[in-house]
Structure formats: structure tokens, C-alpha cells
Curated annotation (Swiss-Prot):
Requisite cofactors: pyridoxal 5'-phosphate
E.C. number(s) listed in UniProt: 2.3.1.37
Catalytic activity: succinyl-CoA + glycine + H(+) = 5-aminolevulinate + CO2 + CoA
Superkingdom classification of source: Eukaryota
Subunit structure of this chain's protein: Homodimer.
GO biological process entries: positive regulation of organelle assembly; protoporphyrinogen IX biosynthetic process
Transit peptide (first-last residue): 1-26
Cellular compartments annotated: Mitochondrion matrix
Pfam families: Aminotran_1_2
Catalytic site: K319
Major location category of this protein: mitochondrion
Protein name (record): 5-aminolevulinate synthase, mitochondrial
Native source organism of the sequence: Candida glabrata (strain ATCC 2001 / BCRC 20586 / JCM 3761 / NBRC 0622 / NRRL Y-65 / CBS 138)
Chain positions with N6-(pyridoxal phosphate)lysine modification: K319
Length: 530
């Protein structure tokens, strides 16, 4: 039988002063223990007598509120098929639908070159990065991708994040935390990621009406030019398809001493001769001629292009580039600063090497394939015209987004459900809080793969749903005075961002330097050595 061995400590003689001080400490400890015991008994009494907080009941109550205000979300099981784009299957593989609302705008998620790059990388480097950028997660695919992104936007550096939500939150909040007295100016329709970043920045903020630059200027005038300022806005606003006047915002930023923060999430891949976004598209011809190089500066030494003038550009890898992740492109100093201070970048595992490699290949491919952007634009125009000719209310905009106005959350969901079940077409209903109440809509996003034949089927199906549900058409909105430009006789539509001349160019009209360019790794991706 096992018996524990008792070890007896040897007896020592201590000096009187040590014994006395130890006795005092023991007495104090005893008193403290008595007080603690009394407090503990009180706590114990609370623990046995009081009813604990009902967490499950609280969760149920909060969910009930979402259901009551029609903002509860139902997820559709959609499995997009790489070899049958734009088809997807639902739970059963023979239950196929045509997807009309994906943000895979150029269908690069199925591109053979992108997939091949990912396969080769996963075979060579494995499934995961193995750590954060600082600990075992910094690698060649990451550095190559950041170099590609910087080259795309013609900036000194770029930094990849796990998503653009994280990128927007991390950069904006860091600016607020580190730039004393910063004041932030934000468009009212900015994405949730920017709104959260502004909240985390914990700095004074001013929200200006959507694309109302007169009001923005009034707000900027409230502060001395020496006060640090940040103007946060998007190029293409994803739910309405409206577009910011980037050049004029840059004018205001220079006039009043502000940094510009531009979210190009729904524009990269789709605008500009090389897919860098609306900022590049503003100087389409200059960038087309220069190719991957920076267009020459003007005679007065001032930067010529709008893309040059924007201080920070954020974007996503998960839409036009067909993979996942987000990024910011900016000056080398700003990128190094974010790399060194932003918790959202520092304390998270690096994206898998295969994802980085696939995204880099997607950027290279789309840069030299102008036809992808042009086909997407042509298909969008075809759908918009077909719907408009039938009196179906499309919120007017100059971009690739096709928002079909419904104006009621229940009817928007019913319309989406009928399209799915009756017509085998998937178009997601967009309700509050993504859009304001009373402006609920269906959001359609054509791609290069949505041919005119598929578009005709979609247009007929939407028309059938409008008839079945007796949904308001353009003439009905006219009788109500119009909404969001639909049925508004005083509304002046903006011309499409793509001109007929731009749509007439071919891939061969691009500068030869965009085909298989050699892009060097950036020092700032690893850290700048002094």
C-alpha cells in the first residue's frame, strides 16, 4: 500500500526582529482573511438566493426583434459550380439555379490560371500560412501579392489583411487612435466596416449627405487647415450603384488639409484600363497609354492623375479577384506605419499562401484582359435596358449594379423566393439594415458569363414576378413622386462611367508592359531597413 512520505522542515532560529515582523504580517493576513471570508459569505448568499441572468432568453428576445422588423436574415444554400458558371446547386446536386447576385464580378474564382496557381502553391507550401506575419507567416506569395497590389494602384506599398472589413476598420481606427485631434468626415452611405472603424477611432466625426460635396465643404470649413482631417468615402456604393466624384473630393482635401480614404471594393477589376478602380478610370487614357508605369507629371510638378491624389485606397480580393482577403495601398511610410501598429493586421494569422498566389494571378490576368470589364459592362447595360423597357424600376446609376426597387421587405423576400423556386434564378433580397426601410430591393450583378440569352430569361422572370405580386412599376413610383431617382421626373441620370470609345478598345490597345510584367518585391512588406 502506498504511503506518502512526510518531509519535516528543519527548525531554524530567527533573529527577534524577523520573528516580530513575521508575526505582524501573519496577524494582518488573518484579519484580511476574515474580511474576505465575510465578503465571500455575502457573495455566496447572492449566488444562492438570486436568479441568474437569462442569457438564452435575451438572445431569443433580440432575435424576435429582428423577425418583427423584417431584418432577420435567411441564408440560401448556394454552391457555385466552377465548371458550369454561372450555375450553382443547392442542397441536392441536381437542384441547379442560375446565380445573378454574386460579387464574383469577373468570374475569376473559376479561372484556370488562377486555379492552377493555387494548386501549385498548396502542393508546395501546404494549406495554411502557419502563423502571423511576424511569426512564421511571412512568405513569398504574400510579398508577391502586395507588390502586385501596389503596382495595380501605382502606390509605393500595399498591405494585405484577412478581409477588407478588417482593413477598413484597422486603418481608420488606427488613424483615430494615433493622430491627435483628428476629425473624420464620412459619407452617410459608407460601408459598415468604415462606420465601425470610425466608431473605434473615437474621434469627432461629421456625416455628410450622400455625395453632397457642398455639405462636406461646409463641414470642412468649421476647422482650421492645421487640424488633421480624414475624408472617408467609397467609389462605387454597392447597394445603389452610385459613384463618388473622387476628383472633386481630392480638391476639397487639398484645400482644407485632409487625408483621403477611398474604398474601391466594388470597383477594382471593373473600372480603369487595368482594373484598378474608378480612380484609375478617371484618367482612363493616361493610364492606358502608360500601362503599368506611372503617367508623367504635369508641367507644374503636380501629380496628374486622380489615383495619385488619393492617399489611401482599400480594396478586396474576394469580389472581382475571385479569392478572399482585403488590402490597403498607400505611401511606403503609411504602409509601414499600419504594418507596425494596427492590431487587426499584427495579431491574426496570415491568409493561406495558395490564396495569396491565386489573388496575385487574378490581378495579373485581369490587368491585361480589358475585354472582361467591357463584357461585364455590356451585359449590365443589356439587363438594365431590358428591365426598363418593361417598366421595371431599376434605381438609376452609372455603374455595374442593377438594383431593382421593391420598397417592401416582405415583398422583396417573396420576389426572391419566387425567382428561386419557380424560375430557378437566385437573386438575393436586400432589406434593412443593409438599405434603409422603404427602399428594399433585389440586387442583380451581371458578369461576363451572363450572356444575352441568360439575360432574356432573367428579364422575363422578373417581369413575371412583378405581375404575380403586383409590385409597383416605374409609373406607380411616378404617381408617388418618385424614389431614389425611380419615377422622379426631375432626376437627371448620370452617364455611364464607360464611354463608347473606352468600350471599343481591345486588349491589344493596352501598353505591352502590362503583359507578363516583372514586379519587384517591396521592402516595406518585410520592414524598412535603416
Amino acid at each position: 500500500m502506498f504511503r506518502p512520505v512526510l518531509k519535516v522542515r528543519p527548525s531554524f532560529s530567527y533573529p527577534y526582529s524577523i520573528v516580530s515582523s513575521r508575526s505582524v504580517r501573519l496577524a494582518s493576513t488573518a484579519t484580511a482573511n476574515a474580511n474576505t471570508a465575510a465578503a465571500t459569505s455575502t457573495v455566496a448568499a447572492h449566488g444562492t438566493q438570486e436568479t441568474p441572468f437569462d442569457f438564452e432568453g435575451h438572445f431569443e428576445s433580440e432575435l424576435a426583434k429582428k423577425r418583427l422588423d423584417k431584418s432577420y436574415r435567411y441564408f440560401n444554400n448556394i454552391n457555385r459550380l466552377a465548371k458550369e458558371f454561372p450555375l450553382a446547386h443547392r442542397q441536392l446536386e441536381d437542384d441547379k439555379v442560375t446565380v445573378w447576385c454574386s460579387n464574383d464580378y469577373l468570374a475569376l474564382s473559376k479561372n484556370p490560371q488562377v486555379l492552377d496557381a493555387m494548386r501549385k502553391t498548396i502542393d508546395k507550401y501546404g494549406a495554411g500560412a502557419g502563423g502571423t506575419r511576424n511569426i512564421a507567416g511571412h512568405n513569398i506569395p504574400t510579398m508577391r501579392l502586395e507588390a502586385e497590389l501596389a503596382a495595380l494602384h501605382k502606390k509605393e506599398g500595399a498591405l494585405v489583411f484577412s478581409s477588407c472589413y478588417v482593413a477598413n476598420d484597422a486603418v481608420i481606427s488606427l488613424l483615430g487612435q494615433k493622430v491627435k485631434d483628428l476629425v473624420i468626415f464620412s459619407d452617410e452611405l459608407n460601408h459598415a466596416s468604415m462606420i465601425v472603424g470610425i466608431k473605434h477611432a473615437n474621434r469627432p466625426k461629421h456625416i455628410f449627405r450622400h455625395n453632397d460635396l457642398a455639405q462636406l465643404e461646409e463641414m470642412l470649413q468649421m476647422y482650421p487647415k492645421s487640424t488633421p482631417k480624414l475624408i472617408a468615402f467609397e467609389s462605387v456604393y454597392s447597394m445603389a450603384g452610385s459613384v463618388a466624384d473622387i476628383n472633386k473630393i481630392c480638391d476639397l482635401a487639398e484645400k482644407y488639409g485632409a487625408l483621403t480614404f477611398l474604398d474601391e471594393v466594388h470597383a477594382v477589376g471593373l473600372y480603369g484600363p487595368h482594373g484598378a478602380g474608378v480612380a484609375e478610370h478617371c484618367d482612363f487614357e493616361a493610364h492606358r497609354v502608360a500601362g503599368i508605369a506611372t503617367p508623367p507629371q504635369g508641367d507644374n510638378g503636380r501629380l496628374r492623375t486622380v489615383m495619385d491624389r488619393v492617399d489611401m485606397i482599400t480594396g478586396t480580393l474576394g469580389k472581382s479577384f475571385g479569392t478572399v482577403g482585403g488590402y490597403v495601398a498607400a505611401s511606403s511610410k503609411l504602409i509601414d506605419w499600419v504594418r507596425s501598429y494596427a492590431p487587426g493586421f499584427i495579431f491574426t494569422t496570415t491568409l493561406p499562401p495558395a490564396v495569396m498566389a491565386g489573388a496575385a494571378e487574378a490581378i495579373r490576368f485581369q490587368r491585361s484582359h480589358l475585354n472582361l470589364r467591357q463584357d461585364q459592362q455590356r451585359h449590365t447595360a443589356y439587363v438594365k435596358k431590358g428591365l426598363h423597357d418593361l417598366g421595371i424600376p431599376v434605381i438609376p446609376n452609372p455603374s455595374h449594379i442593377v438594383p431593382v426597387l421593391i420598397g417592401n421587405p416582405d415583398l422583396a423576400k417573396q420576389a426572391s423566393d419566387i425567382l428561386m423556386e419557380k424560375h430557378r434564378i437566385y437573386v438575393q433580397a436586400i432589406n434593412f439594415p443593409t438599405v434603409s426601410r422603404g427602399t428594399e430591393r433585389l440586387r442583380i450583378t451581371p458578369t461576363p458569363g451572363h450572356t444575352n440569352d441568360l439575360s432574356d430569361i432573367l428579364i422575363a422572370a422578373v417581369d413575371d414576378v412583378f405581375n404575380e405580386l403586383q409590385l409597383p412599376r416605374i409609373r406607380d413610383w411616378e404617381m408617388q413622386g418618385g424614389l431614389l431617382g425611380v419615377g422622379d421626373k426631375n432626376f437627371v441620370p448620370e452617364p455611364n462611367l464607360w464611354t463608347e470609345e473606352q468600350l471599343s478598345f481591345s486588349n491589344e490597345d493596352l501598353n505591352s508592359n502590362v503583359f507578363e510584367p516583372v514586379i519587384d518585391q517591396l521592402e516595406v512588406s518585410s520592414g524598412v531597413k535603416l
